[in-house]
Each structure stands twice: as C-alpha cells, then as structure tokens.
Amino acid sequence: MLLIDIKDKELSQEEVEILEHPLVSGLILFSRNFHDKVQLEALVKSIRQRVKKPLLITVDQEGGRVQRFREGFTKLPAMQAFHTLAKNPQESTALARQTGWLMAAEMFALDIDLSFAPVLDLGHQCKAIGDRSFGENPDAMLPIAEAFIDGMREMGMATTGKHFPGHGHVLADSHLETPFDDRPKEAIFNRDILPFKQLISKGKLSAVMPAHVIYTQCDSQPASGSEYWLKQVLRNQLNFNGVIFSDDLGMKGAGFMGNFVERSEKAIHAGCDLLLLCNEPEGVIQVLDGLKYQPTKTQTERHISLMKRKTVRWNELEASPRYQQAQQRLTALQNEWLEYKAQHC
C-alpha cells in the first residue's frame, strides 16, 4: 500500500521495522541514498536480505535533470532532446527506445524493480516538467514516448505514465503548492489526455501516476484524490486495469487533501492502489498508526506484477556491444542537449 523512503546510504534497524509493517509495500530511493555503484548494490542487497518480505524498490531515473544515480551510470538524455536534436523521426524513436532499454537494464543490474517513467505531460510551461516532456504536440511526441516504453518493456520493466491527465500547462510546481488548471474540459480531453489514452489502448502502460493538480472545470479535488479522474475517467472511460500510484503525498501540492492520514484515505478512496509518501518520516508513522485499510487481493496482485522478473549482471551488461554503443550515443546526446540549452535558454 505505502511506498516510503529511507534517510541515508545504509539501512537502519528502525527502518527495517517500518518496512516490515503490513501496510508498507516498497520504497523509493533518492540521490541522498547514493554514493556510488558499489554502495548502492550493497544497500539494495541489505534491503532484500534484512526485510523479511518482498519489497518493490523504485527510483526516479528518468534521464536529464531527474536522474538519481549518476556516478558510474550512463548520463541519460532529457526526453525533450529526442525530438529537438534528432535528424528525423526515425532517429528520435530509435534513440528513445535505446534510452528506455538501457535505463531499465542498469536498474535491473542493481536489483531495482522500476523507475517511474515515462513523463507523458505535454508542453514545457510548467517548470517542474520542462524538458522532462517528450514534446508539446501529442501526435509528434507519442511515437517517441512509445519507443521509450518499448525499450523498457523489452528489458522487462514495468512502465508508469505520469502525471495523469497532464501536468504540463500549469505554472505552479506541485512540489511547492497545489496547482490549478482552469482550462475547459475539452482542452484537456482533446490534448493532454491523448498520450495516456492511446498508450492504455495499446496495453503499453503498467501503471499510471496522477497529478497533484486541480482541474477546476472538471472536479474540485486534485487528480490524485479524485474519484472522477481515477474511477470515472481512468478506470471506466479509458479501461485502464493496471496500477494507480499516487504521486508523493508529502508534496505541498497534496496538502489540499488534509493531513497525511486524510491524504492517504482520500487517495485510496479515489482509486489509488499504491501511495508514495516521502521526506516525511513522522507522516509515515502517522499513516501506519492511523490508516485503517486492508489492501484488496486485486491491489496485491497489481503490486506484485510490477516486480522485476529478469536478472541482469552488470559485468555482462557492460561487455555487451549493444550496451556500449547505446551508452556512447546517449551520453553524447545529453551533452549535445546541455549545449543546446545553454545557447537557446
């Protein structure tokens, strides 16, 4: 039910006990949990061995500025780089697929189950999204996003489309406040929701993460706590039957829904299967003590479906010609992107 974080680069006994709580299903790792590849491998191994139940271990390893593990890992390009710098659509989709495959391979080699990717938000108006987006035009960005997903799926990693139904057209950052999107319903359904709709119809999304955004012309609650968005639209209209993650309930944008227990209750009632609660250790304890909920059999099955099913050895990965070629090209692309941004932004 809950995905939480840990404080540092080693696992404390107190954290072991919290992770063994029946309501905790997994954890998300951050840059503060990472020093180098050797340390990270030891940390993940410690989690797997000391916590006496299967845990979903996750990270945000999108690429560009949202890449928690850097030293010793491939410098992944920002998603906007594919469309902007590629010579033609064929090259942009090939690069995106390489990135999805390589990212998933590197995570599996460290025994990490999934990276929360890809971002399917349109546009770069929101600073929290920016170049994390594949583009502003749904028709142009969809093949690139789908190629990235196909790369992840080839490696066997579950995919998470975020931030439903679209976070790209608000100025506010939901890490800091609750954003309001005042556009007409038709604008959202005719543009922002299209990448989610089409990828769901093709069976390409294992999970969806809703936004902490209030779409004022549609509902009074943030999408992450909205029955309208999660049950009526996502489940019933789009026929999505995968996992629904809440975005981090510790973010300021979730504060609209009340205290931590109330946020969790509203997210569950709205339709979320797994809840992220990060950077709020006291909030985690409050939820574990105060949340009266037993995950359903369906929710448990959805949770298990996200776990890694392929073993990748780092030395074998590094020796692979495909990996070597992809790493070289993608590192160069991200360097090109940083130069491009320096000149044009």
Curated annotation (Swiss-Prot):
Disulfide bonds: none annotated. It comes from the Bacteria. GO terms for cellular component: cytoplasm. Keywords: Cell cycle, Cell division, Cell shape, Cell wall biogenesis/degradation, Cytoplasm, Glycosidase, Hydrolase, Peptidoglycan synthesis. Its EC number is 3.2.1.52. It catalyses: Hydrolysis of terminal non-reducing N-acetyl-D-hexosamine residues in N-acetyl-beta-D-hexosaminides. The record marks D173 as: Important for catalytic activity. SUPFAM superfamilies: (Trans)glycosidases (SSF51445). The active site is at H175 (proton donor/acceptor), D247 (nucleophile). Coiled coil: none annotated. One of its GO terms (molecular function) is beta-N-acetylhexosaminidase activity. Substrate binds at D60, R68, R132, K162, H163. GO terms for biological process: carbohydrate metabolic process; cell division; cell wall organization; peptidoglycan biosynthetic process; peptidoglycan turnover; regulation of cell shape. It is found in: Cytoplasm. Pathway: Cell wall biogenesis; peptidoglycan recycling. Its main location: cytoplasm. PANTHER family: BETA-HEXOSAMINIDASE, BETA-HEXOSAMINIDASE-RELATED. Belongs to the glycosyl hydrolase 3 family. NagZ subfamily. HAMAP family: NagZ. Plays a role in peptidoglycan recycling by cleaving the terminal beta-1,4-linked N-acetylglucosamine (GlcNAc) from peptide-linked peptidoglycan fragments, giving rise to free GlcNAc, anhydro-N-acetylmuramic acid and anhydro-N-acetylmuramic acid-linked peptides. This is Beta-hexosaminidase. The gene is nagZ.
